[in-house]
A protein has these predicted regions:
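Active-site-adjacent structural elements that line small-molecule/cofactor binding pockets in enzymes
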Residues: 1-290
Length: 290
């Protein structure tokens, strides 16, 4: 059965993440996802993939792990996700600790959406060369896996290199939280099969998908499964999609395509604007879960 979640840029001017989380759980949503940007360089050289003027929530968003900790503290079952976390801008040892701590304290409710990012200047302010972001993401993710799974992890790569260490706590979920890849290039599916657990693309409407450069979701799901089997991975990859609006026909299509989780998009706004939308989204979700 398809699960339904919510995504919002958590900012200082929006409804508090703990308030949103409580309401999300009350309405029966399975998950809450929060995006990440540490900052946005004022030069604005890198064009926003959304095409229009970059919304201000991109440089006002809270740290997702801190905001999700607040959400975890007031809920019991709601899964807590990053949508997405920019691993390319984080120290892997520190991030492994943060992820494991939150997963442990939330009793195994974390979902780790990851990506390499699109803002070259933002990334380079963290010391990450934009052209090398994908190899760096790969090594940092593999290194975190080692820290979550091994008693004395060590890792020796081009970008991450450390001898045996002691690093606790381990995540509550064995092997760490599920890692969902937020990308849609032709390389995405092999990357998922190597070091992630599923695919989490951004939603595009049918017209956008049919245009040049649009994402073919059916093909993406099929290619992910094919790469998964070629790697000899056990089980099945997970398929989530985020940024969906209040469109019943779109949701029906995504469910039919085989997405395990559909994540509705909320504006970064005050409670009196955001919370009424939960009832609308919940009514749509109910049609596919009842």
């Amino acid at each position: 059965m398809t699960q339904f979640g919510l995504l919002m840029f958590a900012t200082e001017y929006a409804v508090a993440p703990q308030v949103l989380a409580q309401q999300a759980e009350m309405y029966g949503f399975e998950s809450l996802f929060l995006p990440e940007h540490t900052h946005i360089p004022a030069s604005r050289k890198s064009p926003w993939p959304g095409g229009a003027e970059l919304p201000k929530e991109y440089w006002h968003t809270f740290d997702p792990f801190i905001a999700l900790t607040m959400a975890a503290s007031v809920t019991q079952k709601l899964k807590l996700g990053t949508g997405i976390s920019l691993v390319t801008e984080r120290d892997p040892i520190l991030m492994a600790k943060q992820v494991a701590s939150l997963d442990h304290l939330s009793d195994g409710r974390l979902i780790l959406g990851i990506g390499a990012g699109w803002n070259a200047e933002e990334m380079e302010n963290h010391g990450t060369p934009f052209a090398r972001r994908w190899p760096i993401l790969r090594e940092r993710t593999l290194a975190m896996r080692e820290m979550w799974c091994q008693e004395e992890p060590e890792f020796h790569g081009e970008f991450v290199d450390f001898d045996k260490i002691w690093c606790y706590p381990k995540p509550k979920q064995a092997g760490g939280p599920p890692i969902l890849m937020g990308a849609s290039s032709r390389y995405t599916y092999d990357r998922i099969a190597e070091y992630a657990d599923g695919w989490m693309p951004i939603y595009q409407n049918r017209a956008r998908r049919q245009a040049s450069g649009g994402v073919d979701y059916a093909a993406g799901i099929a290619k992910t499964k094919e790469a998964w089997q070629a790697r000899g991975r056990k089980g099945s990859p997970q398929f989530s999609i985020f940024g969906v609006g209040a469109d019943r026909r779109a949701v029906a299509e995504l469910v039919e395509l085989g997405f395990d989780r559909v994540i509705f998009s909320l504006p970064s706004d005050a409670a009196d604007v955001v919370l009424p939308l939960l009832e609308k989204y919940a009514s749509i979700a109910h049609e596919f879960t009842s």
